[in-house]
């Protein structure tokens, strides 16, 4: 790790003089800068010392440094609310309507493997029952559930209802603090599916456009347009979902700084 950091800071020092402005995140790469700051604090640094390290060693801007320290401190406070017997449950649905060119997740398209959805769901429901028994025997309690994939909403409303009923029937959700379903592709979202999710107690859904530029969406293998994203978002709001998160990816095929700015503005 030390060698990696040395290489990054060396490259940063060599390249930055030729840039129109220094990157606000300095030499940091990746998606979790707060993890770095948290590690510093847990190793004995004060928040102030960690901030100095971020600014002077990693060249992070003062504004981003303050944000990173706040995020690290918040995460550490949240950890204190998690009990020794609290666990999180992940349920994977490895099917998608199409495969995005950048995707590295384990997933199959419905065109290729749609016939496997029902037997997969049969097996998954049995695994849910067996896993719930192990959780009870260990004295654990589920405090968060995340159903991801793939795209869980490739299941139709009846299959979704079956899955959610299996979870509710076998797990104790009385301590549940967060229940999320990654709806993901707007072309798989319908009012009927949203009603099933809401009635089962799901509190948060993901609707992930990645881009709001139709040419970019076509280039990455998506089978929907930007209008479908807006439609799905409105339907989720109408179904009563107040917590909706959305993923965007910069630098996709055909994307430019201007088209990505338009995506963010949308």
Question: At which residue positions do the language-model features occur?
Answer:
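N-terminal alpha-helical segment
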Residues: 30-33, 213
């Amino acid at each position: 790790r030390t060698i990696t950091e040395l290489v990054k800071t060396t490259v940063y020092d060599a390249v930055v003089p030729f840039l129109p402005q220094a990157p606000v995140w300095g030499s940091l790469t990746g998606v979790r800068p707060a993890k770095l700051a948290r590690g510093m604090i847990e190793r004995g640094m004060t928040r102030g010392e960690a901030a100095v390290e971020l600014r002077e060693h990693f060249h992070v801007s003062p504004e981003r440094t303050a944000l990173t320290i706040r995020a690290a401190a918040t995460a550490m406070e949240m950890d204190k609310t998690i009990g020794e017997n609290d666990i999180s449950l992940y349920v994977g649905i490895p099917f998608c309507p199409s495969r995005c060119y950048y995707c590295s997740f384990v997933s199959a398209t419905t065109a290729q493997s749609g016939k496997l959805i029902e037997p997969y769901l049969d097996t998954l429901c049995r695994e849910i029952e067996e896993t719930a028994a192990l959780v009870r025997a260990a004295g654990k309690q589920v405090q968060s559930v995340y159903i991801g994939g793939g795209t869980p909403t490739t299941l139709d409303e009846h299959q979704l209802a079956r899955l959610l009923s299996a979870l509710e029937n076998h797990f104790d959700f009385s301590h549940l603090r967060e229940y999320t379903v990654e709806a993901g592709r707007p072309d798989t979202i319908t009012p009927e599916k949203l009603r099933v999710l809401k009635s089962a107690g799901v509190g948060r859904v993901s609707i992930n456009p990645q881009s709001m530029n139709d040419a970019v969406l076509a280039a990455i293998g998506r089978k929907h347009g930007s209008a479908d994203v807006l439609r799905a978002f409105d339907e989720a709001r109408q179904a009563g979902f107040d917590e909706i998160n959305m993923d965007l990816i910069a630098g996709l095929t055909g994307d430019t700084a201007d088209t990505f700015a338009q995506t963010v503005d949308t």
